[in-house]
């Protein structure tokens, strides 16, 4: 079990990052709500991790705080929810927003998430309500606020930002036409890919 990883952030390709730890690059997938809080490439960061072993792959999922990882693991206990869907859920809304949606029986909000139909949303509300009774948010390793386009790599080309945003949204479960439609509403050449993804997810949710 790999509980956390600390290393130099060498690549950011939403929703995946690469951390260099003594010459070894670890590919880690993050919910976009965590991705927004990352520092620029080249800085050292520490991520709480969840390790998944499958027959065809070994995957690492990363989080800013232990409570986010705990919520991810609770989601995995729900019937029909695997790591990909859990990642999409926590990309579409913050941990606090998800907990609020469950506590308020807000099925309408949940079905807007990619891969979540009405039955899955109802199951999430029923199965997660009791599990979340003792859930408490914890302090993340970094107190960085979500970074805007000024805090990211200014060298990113607008066309690349749009392409990366579409790719990231598709990896989270949205169809290409859904991603395109959402990006049309928020696109600006001044936005980098992370800002575009954040704004598009607001449109989609």
Swiss-Prot record:
Its main location: cytoplasm. InterPro entries: DNA_helicase_Holl-junc_RuvA_I, Hlx-hairpin-Hlx_DNA-bd_motif, NA-bd_OB-fold, RuvA, RuvA_2-like, RuvA_C, RuvA_C_sf. One of its GO terms (molecular function) is ATP binding. Residues 1-64 are annotated as: Domain I. Residues 65-143 are annotated as: Domain II. Gene3D superfamilies: 5' to 3' exonuclease, C-terminal subdomain, DNA helicase RuvA subunit, C-terminal domain, Nucleic acid-binding proteins. Homotetramer. Forms an RuvA(8)-RuvB(12)-Holliday junction (HJ) complex. HJ DNA is sandwiched between 2 RuvA tetramers; dsDNA enters through RuvA and exits via RuvB. An RuvB hexamer assembles on each DNA strand where it exits the tetramer. Each RuvB hexamer is contacted by two RuvA subunits (via domain III) on 2 adjacent RuvB subunits; this complex drives branch migration. In the full resolvosome a probable DNA-RuvA(4)-RuvB(12)-RuvC(2) complex forms which resolves the HJ. Has three domains with a flexible linker between the domains II and III and assumes an 'L' shape. Domain III is highly mobile and contacts RuvB. This is Holliday junction branch migration complex subunit RuvA. It comes from Idiomarina loihiensis (strain ATCC BAA-735 / DSM 15497 / L2-TR). The lineage of its organism: Bacteria, Pseudomonadati, Pseudomonadota, Gammaproteobacteria, Alteromonadales. The gene is ruvA.
